[in-house]
């Protein structure tokens, strides 16, 4: 919204933090009433908790503890932002238990990424303005680098679901969304994200070739071949 200071940052952050705080009230109540909603120890949970403790100490001992905790309107990060993300992590980990529940969560996130990608597509077609000016797509983020990072996560989520499903129509849908988001990633012109995506593909392909068998392994080999041959073809042409 244009009425906010740094509208692409503050609006999303205030909305996220308010929603997390409301969810936290419901979650704490549910955790007291029903044991299944209480956090369970895991390697990831312990690692994240240690990280939060270290960041808390770093905040207190920083040059400006006030700014380290509250950050600024330009970024809206700081330790207060980490605390909300940590709370979100605890709520998700305590609420979603089964693979089906996690699948629904990630599919909801993918649906949102499709809407964001179509926004970028309309920018590419000249139907919507690019907020930064120039030609780098930024969609609803107002920043091409943020959009690229967002798409980076969802591209790998799409790869995961593509490899795990055996239904042709699902694979076709995942593949179509993957191509859409890959095009938008390219037109963000964010070199770091694009190189990171290529490096991630190589690493994922190597791991799948080593650890998987059957169809997944064949897809991994095909992907590795494409990563090598496509840049080579551009170079030769």
What feature does the model see in each segment?
Residues 6-7, 63-73:
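Membrane-interfacial interhelical loops
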Residues 2-14, 31-38, 165-166:
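Short, hydrophobic transmembrane alpha-helix segments
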Residues 7-16, 38-44, 73-76, 141:
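Interfacial loop-to-helix junctions that mark the boundaries of transmembrane helices
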Residues 33-48, 64:
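Extended hydrophobic/aromatic-rich secondary-structure runs
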Residues 1-2, 17-29, 47-65, 78-237:
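Alpha-helical transmembrane segments of multi-pass inner-membrane proteins
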